[in-house]
UniProtKB/Swiss-Prot annotation:
Cellular location(s): Cytoplasm
One biological process term in Gene Ontology: centromere clustering
E.C. no: 3.1.3.16
InterPro entries, per database record: Calcineurin-like_PHP_ApaH, Metallo-depent_PP-like, PP1_catalytic_subunit, Ser/Thr-sp_prot-phosphatase, STPPase_N
UniProt GO cellular component terms: cell cortex of growing cell tip; cell cortex of non-growing cell tip; cell division site; CENP-A containing chromatin; cytoplasm; DPS complex; mRNA cleavage and polyadenylation specificity factor complex; nucleus
Similarity section: Belongs to the PPP phosphatase family. PP-1 subfamily.
Cofactor binding, per record: Binds 2 manganese ions per subunit.
Protein name, as recorded: Serine/threonine-protein phosphatase PP1
Names of required cofactors: Mn(2+)
Top-level taxonomy: Eukaryota, Fungi, Dikarya, Ascomycota, Pezizomycotina
Binding site for Mn(2+) 1: 64, 66, 92
Amino acid sequence: MADHTEVDLDSIIDRLLEVRGSRPGKQVQLLEAEIRYLCTKAREIFISQPILLELEAPIKICGDIHGQYYDLLRLFEYGGFPPEANYLFLGDYVDRGKQSLETICLLLAYKIKYPENFFILRGNHECASINRIYGFYDECKRRYNIKLWKTFTDCFNCLPIAAIIDEKIFTMHGGLSPDLNSMEQIRRVMRPTDIPDCGLLCDLLWSDPDKDITGWSENDRGVSFTFGPDVVSRFLQKHDMDLICRAHQVVEDGYEFFSKRQLVTLFSAPNYCGEFDNAGAMMSVDESLLCSFQILKPAEKKQKFGRR
């Protein structure tokens, strides 16, 4: 383990940001000891903060990033680099994209630097059994070693699961759970924890809304459930909330409303995997809880940032 006094956090952030303006794909190879420091220090902060975060607006919320590091940099260029704005990320930082390491390292570095202004939740890909398969393990093994992947797993197992903004906006990676009756159930979950195959924690990271159903139904993913607009309305009414904000699904415009604007899906990886022609979006919540969207067009289109 590196002696933490030797590690220069500002230098790590500077090197990660140095590639702004370089050709997308240029890598930043931090020292293994520096990455271990990021994982260990961030883990301490996650554990010291609640598993169900209670946050205040104004805040900017981002959905899946999936290793698209240069798009993450574009999001910050658009929304303001921390601490210019407060941020909440909804999970899925690793896998599928080419630069999971830079992506997660910058997010962890900002978490350590600005622990009260920068927040990241756990996605279903911040789980060893998933990121072992979809790219992160291979990237760690290729660029560093398997032991480092295990260090990330220890860190991911301590990430918070959900956040409530000003008691009115409920955010998580996936969606609601048929097992969720009270917020206290989330608060009681002990960390470190893996993501189980079923139950509350699994659903919060895996479930999806479905406009064509009533109640709960099985999910095509083979994990968790889907839930209808009636479930969303009942939940918000019961908990006196206004909006559910989640990620987990690619949506064409980067954001998509559901159930009469009672739920919004955010996806922040434009041109996802190079296979989709989707935009990416970031949701800005102002002090009065008014939500607006900032759109990142797919980079390929050679357009600067569009707004809508």
